[in-house]
Amino acid sequence: MAASVKDRAVLDAIFNPLLPLGDCPQEIIEEELPIENTNEDDVKRAKEYEIQGVEKAEAGDFVGALDCFNKAIDVAPLRASGYNNRAQLSRLRGDNQSAMEDLNKAIELSHEHGAAAAQAYTQRGLLHRLEGNDEAASEDFQHGATLGNAFAKAMTVQLNPYAAMCNKMLAEAIGKLSGHA
């Protein structure tokens, strides 16, 4: 059962409360590389566990959600999405170290391709930013932006000092032209 665009928007808002609504580009959502040594039934079961995990997280049952994400990873350990979802849950629970480990694994397994990679790079960029490591955050946001994540694109601009200076100058110029300066 594929989630609708509205369902994906709601799930994205739940798992990424700091991200702007609707930032997940449609063209990368469905992309998933075939996974070697994993049969389609296992992938289907893993996706079902992930959906159950998201539903439990939405209901505030983080322990139940974690159990579902762990089952998804057990069933399809080479699938990046399970690690990415568990990382998002870990971040919500305040366990940034576990989140970082899962995001690193998601990036490795995704081969830097598709929605899982875009989300993992963006989430890892947020964790780096929380740690005060803006250089690493900028690199991850650039990767996420390249893969189509709109929030990562915005953060790439925000962390670029030249872009920030240009944005400030542009805002001042527009303010002067409109008489608000």
From Swiss-Prot:
The keyword Repeat applies. It holds the Pfam family TPR_8. TPR repeats lie at residues 46-79, 81-113, 118-151. Keywords: Repeat, TPR repeat. GO terms for biological process: tyrosine metabolic process. SUPFAM superfamilies: TPR-like. PROSITE patterns: TPR, TPR_REGION. Belongs to the TTC36 family. This is Tetratricopeptide repeat protein 36 homolog. It comes from Nematostella vectensis (Starlet sea anemone). The lineage of its organism: Eukaryota, Metazoa, Cnidaria, Anthozoa, Hexacorallia. The gene is ttc36.
